[in-house]
Amino acid sequence: MAYRKLGRTSSQRKAMFRDLTTDLLINESIVTTEARAKEIRKTVEKMITLGKRGNLHARRQAAAFVRNEIASESYDEAKDEYTSTTALQKLFSEIAPRYAERNGGYTRILKTEPRRGDAAPMAIIELV
């Protein structure tokens, strides 16, 4: 299996992929290097496919990979309480139904200008 090492050990690389995948699911668009964008595209597509499957096993598989971060928070004045949505809940309730009719190709990578400090090729990865 071919993959990019990205100058990191395997555990560091896996942690970075988990972080970037979770950030992309929460924000639906992130700016990163081109190599990282091409690598996390694989994991994001797998997570959305799990979300489309929607059964308990798929939810547990996605929960094992996606970080437990708050995607959105709202305040209900009538009940005087805050309600929050995690990245996993957003994946299964908002993102996956959006792509119910689409078979793959859930992300788009747009190349941008090189980073100022080290001229690394940058890209915007976003959900289609």
From Swiss-Prot:
Q: Which Gene3D superfamilies match?
A: Ribosomal protein L17
- Give a Gene Ontology cellular component term annotated to this protein: cytosolic large ribosomal subunit
What keywords are annotated for this sequence in UniProt? Ribonucleoprotein, Ribosomal protein
Organism, by scientific name, is Streptococcus mutans serotype c (strain ATCC 700610 / UA159)
Which proteins does it associate with, and in what oligomeric form? Part of the 50S ribosomal subunit. Contacts protein L32.
Its Gene Ontology biological processes? translation
Gene Ontology molecular-function annotations: structural constituent of ribosome
Q: Which family does it belong to?
A: Belongs to the bacterial ribosomal protein bL17 family.
A Pfam family found in this protein is Ribosomal_L17
State the name under which the record lists this protein: Large ribosomal subunit protein bL17
Q: Which superkingdom does the taxonomy of this entry point to?
A: Bacteria
Biological classification of the source: Bacteria, Bacillati, Bacillota, Bacilli, Lactobacillales
> InterPro entries recorded for this chain?
Ribosomal_bL17 (IPR000456), Ribosomal_bL17_CS (IPR047859), Ribosomal_bL17_sf (IPR036373)
